[in-house]
A protein has these predicted regions:
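Residues forming the flavin
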Residues: 1-131
Length: 131
């Protein structure tokens, strides 16, 4: 993170950890990061821990998933696909877990449309940066 913005990822290798090898993690710089880790919201959770109270959610932290409601989950997955912290976007079930939508339900349609939506958002943001 730089200046209150996600600017990439640090990737730890589980195989390296299991083998007890001393290998540094990979550092990847990126203009945007998408958390599509599903229910666990792994990337959003790390940001929440490192910069408490800064997420763009009603409670400024991960809202958590609500009970299963397939019909609602389909539409809310799309609505919740957005930027949650500068440079960090959420998609799929990570979006519902972050913004408090119902768990499960969006099996194919909502999940695919969520990925398409976040890709379009990033393309738009990248083209706006070039101007």
């Amino acid at each position: 993170m730089r200046k209150s913005r996600v600017t990439g990822l640090v990737l730890n290798w589980s195989a390296v950890e299991i083998a007890h090898l001393h290998v540094d993690p990979l550092a990847v710089r990126s203009q945007f990061v998408v958390d599509a880790t599903g229910h666990e919201t792994a990337v959003v959770r790390l940001v929440q821990d490192k910069v408490p109270g800064k997420l763009k959610t009603p409670s400024v932290k991960i809202e958590g998933e609500k009970s299963m409601w397939s019909d609602k989950a389909e539409s809310l997955t799309l609505r919740n696909t957005r930027e949650v912290f500068p440079g960090l976007y959420v998609a799929g079930m990570a979006a519902n877990a972050t913004f408090g939508g119902p768990r499960m339900g969006p099996i194919f349609g909502g999940m695919l449309l969520s990925g398409e939506k976040v890709a379009d958002m990033l393309l738009h943001a990248l083209s706006a940066k070039k101007r």
